[in-house]
């Protein structure tokens, strides 16, 4: 839903703290919002899973047990067993697929003003990090699925990793294509090690800019206290099929995600700024910690005409199954070849 008042919405549109003169904050939730507050999503609830509805639970939903569909899974070892860092010395960095959703056929969904700014900024920084970037605009679900299936079917042997970014409306466990909602595990499941062997042991990165619900985070004011002044690396080894995933959500489950109509979403602004400044220096988890810090500290919604949406906060949510340190080392400085 995009709650709109004075240019602000919840994907939601927001502004940096200290810039109250530009009230352009909105959210990426579902439904509509009037002066009375957030609207309902209209989503059909999915069945519960013992692992929950978050990223880990959704990945587990896509798992086929050996008893039902056994096959011997073997993939080429691209990194030594106990290497501290991922091998980022392949010929190519890898694919980066950006699904940018601005307009929708679903009547309850408003257009996402500001998303093209996010898309342009993300495209630029990913190219600087040597990704091969492809942008898909306002795709229907069947086209998203076809694109993802094709990407997963390619030979990624000469690539370091793969990255998928989705910018859209959403609810907890769901995200919207142009025409309908879908579960995010419908995307991730194509890239598990048993389904995409050429990406086995390599990072699979997903960045989701969308609401995960309609709850608001009013924040807490922090005040200063008055008193304050690993075996043989050459041997083969097995890995779980769901290893080496990282899923970065713009917000925590159940909550709004804010977007500024002129500068883009808080999360993408922060992610792009950190990738541009530190993408080749810091490892990804350290970098994402600073992304969380930027979103949490530097931004606050400005919707004075809608008091219940005014001065709200946001914090991204990172789910990681990475098994090594990931750093986007400079391709021109890294030696050629693979481990």
From Swiss-Prot:
Pfam families membership: Peptidase_C14
GO biological process terms held by the UniProt record: apoptotic process; compound eye retinal cell programmed cell death; execution phase of apoptosis; negative regulation of peptidoglycan recognition protein signaling pathway; negative regulation of Toll signaling pathway; neuron remodeling; nurse cell apoptotic process; positive regulation of neuron apoptotic process
Residue ranges annotated as propeptide in the record: 1-28, 218-230
UniProt keyword Protease, yes or no: yes
Active site location: 169, 211
MF-aspect GO terms: BIR domain binding; cysteine-type endopeptidase activity; ubiquitin protein ligase binding
Means of activity regulation: Zymogen activated by proteolytic cleavage; cleaved by the initiator caspase Dronc upon apoptosis induction.
Organism domain of life: Eukaryota
Key words, A-Z: Apoptosis, Hydrolase, Protease, Thiol protease, Zymogen
EC number of this enzyme: 3.4.22.-
GO CC list: cytoplasm; nucleus; plasma membrane
Annotated stretches, region: Disordered: 1-45
Enzyme class: hydrolase
SUPFAM superfamilies xrefs: Caspase-like
Record bears the keyword Cytoplasm: no
Subunit structure of this chain's protein: Heterotetramer that consists of two anti-parallel arranged heterodimers, each one formed by a 21 kDa (p21) and a 12 kDa (p12) subunit. Inactive pro-form can homodimerize. Dronc and Drice can form a stable complex. Interacts with Diap2 (via BIR3 domain) to form a stable complex. May interact with some isoforms of Dark.
Family in the record: Belongs to the peptidase C14A family.
Function: Involved in the activation cascade of caspases responsible for apoptosis execution. Acts downstream of rpr. Cleaves baculovirus p35 and lamin DmO in vitro.
Name used for this protein in its record: Caspase drICE
Organism: Drosophila melanogaster (Fruit fly)
GN (gene name): Drice
